[in-house]
Amino acid sequence: NAVARLSAGRIEAFAAVAEHLRGAGLSAPEIVALDAPGGLAVIEDFGDDLFARVIENGEPQVPLYLAAVDAIARLHMSGLLPEVMPGPGGGWPLLTYDAVALQGGADLFVQWMPKLFPELDFGPAALEAWHEAWAPVTAMGEQKAWVMAHRDYHAENLIWLPDRTHHRRVGLIDFQDAVLAHPVWDLHSLLQDARRDVPPELEAVALDHYFDVMMVDREVYRRDYAALAALNEARILGVFARLVARDGKPRYRAFMPRMWAHLNANLRKPGLETVAAWFDRHVPAGVRG
């Protein structure tokens, strides 16, 4: 948890992040009552209308995704971030998703994929090349870590609140592991979802919407988006391999082809040639979805 900059489910973290998000004008649950030593809280109920569920029931997804992007943009425009966020359970530090944490996440791929695919053999030379390939990406991720990232921002952690307005229609939950990170982090979590297919044209529209709202350098942000998305997809594949191989949860195999599709596509983007060459050399096509 320390390397990954995780909160270990501490209720103080949830309460402090919730207060910060509400202060930024976003919809995070009100903390009605809190027992920090007991790890318990009574919080506002946003209902059951998860984005994934309402889209499945026929709600047009473009307005929902654009609202979710607006919520990200609102968070990114919320001003200077405190090193320690005050909250009803006490202060909680806003840690940086730095190069060590990013590399530690990526390393789950080389640690766990061979447990699931015995044909993979990552010896010392391969591991050294792995770290060298990702080093520019992790350095970039740390250097540009200047906004709060929800960190698990996807259609099953967002609740549709249609009676509210603008970005406040997006109810946020499961944000206790928020960190200081690159602005693209939550964007790729939302638009290259491990759990559901987001149409490429919707991904493109949503990214353009963010670029328009934030007035950023599109070329630089697209490059960073592909690089950090690729790293996170390698991490997620490692997590899924661990869930299957160690924890006996075979259902997670079903998510792996989607992650491979995203990763393979990102590896073809500019700036990832060294990482792509590593995968071409060390991971056979039969494993890569």
What kind of region is each of these model predictions?
Residues G9, P250, A254-G289:
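Regulatory N- and C-terminal appendages and interdomain linkers associated
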Residues N1-G104, L108, K115, E119, ...:
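ATP-binding pocket architecture of kinase catalytic cores
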Residues A101, F109, A145, H150, ...:
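Secondary-structure capping and boundary motifs in well-ordered enzyme cores
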Residues M113-E128:
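Conserved P-loop NTPase mechanochemical-coupling segment
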Residues Q61-A68, L102, L127-W130, A230, ...:
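Hydrophobic packing residues in well-ordered alpha-helices of helical domains and bundles
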Residues L75, W134-L187, D197:
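Active-site acidic catalytic loop and adjacent metal/ATP-binding pocket
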Residues T96-Y97, R218-A229:
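All-alpha amphipathic helical-bundle segments outside canonical DNA-binding/catalytic cores
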Residues D107-F117, L180-D217, A230-D247, R258-L267:
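Active-site activation/catalytic loop segments of kinase-like enzymes and analogous catalytic loops
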